[in-house]
Amino acid sequence: MNSHQNQTGVQKKGITEKIMEKLPGHHGPTNTGVVHHEKKGMTEKVMEQLPGHHGATGTGGVHHEKKGMTEKVMEQLPGHHGSHQTGTNTTYGTTNTGGVHHEKKSVTEKVMEKLPGHHGSHQTGTNTAYGTNTNVVHHEKKGIAEKIKEQLPGHHGTHKTGTTTSYGNTGVVHHENKSTMDKIKEKLPGGHH
């Protein structure tokens, strides 16, 4: 490739080789029986985190590596199991039976619910990939504004409906308050969804 030798006869890498090593899927040089001390820059540390990049492979040698700030931070992140992680964290066929899901809403979600025409989140059976959730009960916490609205004259209380949905899940119960718009839509001809 673009290898050059300096005055002492030590091979130096050309810019093309340096760039090629940084590209995902490049398998770097192979060293045998070599003691290798390496201090990595920010780019190398980031590139090592990408899937498909395997860096230098040493057989029979000792490889000492000084970890930088990026690697230390990456190891502290949840789900990161060090720099030699193998396999994936994907679960298939997971079955969650009899679980209770309590949802605490963010400020944005609370504000969005107060806006006219917004009917809240209708999410059921989350956090399971390619599996089945059975008997999941979904509770929503009432906010201060909802409690005040119940105390106002003319408010007829909450009408909680227990609906069993079958979107690939069995026995999922989602309790929700009907909005005024939903009640009006039900009264209109053809408004039964």
Curated annotation (Swiss-Prot):
<comment type="similarity">
    <text>Belongs to the plant dehydrin family.</text>
</comment>
<dbReference type="GO" id="GO:0050832">
    <property type="term" value="P:defense response to fungus"/>
</dbReference>
<feature type="region of interest" description="Disordered">
    <location>
        <begin position="153"/>
        <end position="193"/>
    </location>
</feature>
<feature type="region of interest" description="Disordered">
    <location>
        <begin position="78"/>
        <end position="100"/>
    </location>
</feature>
<feature type="compositionally biased region" description="Low complexity">
    <location>
        <begin position="160"/>
        <end position="171"/>
    </location>
</feature>
<dbReference type="InterPro" id="IPR000167">
    <property type="entry name" value="Dehydrin"/>
</dbReference>
<protein>
    <recommendedName>
        <fullName>Dehydrin Xero 2</fullName>
    </recommendedName>
</protein>
<dbReference type="GO" id="GO:0008270">
    <property type="term" value="F:zinc ion binding"/>
</dbReference>
<dbReference type="GO" id="GO:0009737">
    <property type="term" value="P:response to abscisic acid"/>
</dbReference>
<dbReference type="GO" id="GO:0009414">
    <property type="term" value="P:response to water deprivation"/>
</dbReference>
<dbReference type="GO" id="GO:0016151">
    <property type="term" value="F:nickel cation binding"/>
</dbReference>
<dbReference type="GO" id="GO:0005829">
    <property type="term" value="C:cytosol"/>
</dbReference>
<dbReference type="GO" id="GO:0050897">
    <property type="term" value="F:cobalt ion binding"/>
</dbReference>
<dbReference type="GO" id="GO:0016020">
    <property type="term" value="C:membrane"/>
</dbReference>
<dbReference type="InterPro" id="IPR030513">
    <property type="entry name" value="Dehydrin_CS"/>
</dbReference>
<feature type="compositionally biased region" description="Basic and acidic residues">
    <location>
        <begin position="173"/>
        <end position="193"/>
    </location>
</feature>
<dbReference type="GO" id="GO:0005507">
    <property type="term" value="F:copper ion binding"/>
</dbReference>
<feature type="compositionally biased region" description="Low complexity">
    <location>
        <begin position="86"/>
        <end position="99"/>
    </location>
</feature>
<dbReference type="GO" id="GO:0009409">
    <property type="term" value="P:response to cold"/>
</dbReference>
<dbReference type="Pfam" id="PF00257">
    <property type="entry name" value="Dehydrin"/>
</dbReference>
<dbReference type="GO" id="GO:0009631">
    <property type="term" value="P:cold acclimation"/>
</dbReference>
